């Protein structure tokens, strides 16, 4: 029973939540790793022995908890896919635990390019008996999500690139995929979004560019036939 209904039915005198001030939602401006910076970024990642992990991130847009939770068995070499069925998250006590993604659409298979498969196979040869896709060289266990955020910051610093959040690598994947012709529904399914509408709302800037290009194409066509 809601507090408002309890007041209406005179079970309580007043709604104790009415005077509560909701905390402000912290909003972050979406940024992407600019295309001209991608090679510099990946070169810096390679020097740290982290190229497979961050290359995969840029071609898949996985959430950090999904990326760190990957097992070697999640890679389908033949079909060039990654199975996303778990994530590393903090529970209410602040402890890191493995759990299923929060929505069914987040449980998915993500297609990746052959270059990513080759990098992952080469990475696995370095630790063939370890079940984790990206084990920490220190502990042999999977990385904490916050650990790869810190690694990302170090890569940016090494490369002399401006700061962007690790989550912006996910935005980079989605934006570049849309700008290079991937349809919204496919991008949405790869990101694990609930529906294509949420993808459209998030990446309006990318789809608007494609609309502008389509308009110019139609304009050129009409100029030829008139």
Question: Model-predicted segments: where are they?
Answer:
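Non-catalytic DNA-binding core/recognition domains of DNA-processing enzymes
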Residues: 1-5, 112
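Proline-centered turn/helix-capping motifs that create local helix->coil transitions or kinks
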Residues: 6-16, 76-86, 90-93, 122-130, ...
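Basic, Lys/Arg- and aromatic-enriched nucleic-acid-binding interface segment
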Residues: 8, 12-15, 19-72, 77-78, ...
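C-terminal catalytic core of tyrosine-transesterase DNA break-rejoin enzymes
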Residues: 8, 51, 55, 59-66, ...
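Catalytic-site neighborhood detector that most strongly recognizes the C-terminal catalytic loop/helix
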Residues: 24, 32, 88-90, 140, ...
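Active-site/catalytic core of tyrosine-dependent DNA strand-transfer enzymes
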Residues: 36, 79, 87, 113-162
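DNA/chromatin major-groove-contacting recognition/catalytic segments
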Residues: 36, 40-46, 93-100, 201, ...
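C-terminal secondary-structure termini that scaffold catalytic or DNA-interacting sites
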Residues: 79, 92-118, 122, 138, ...
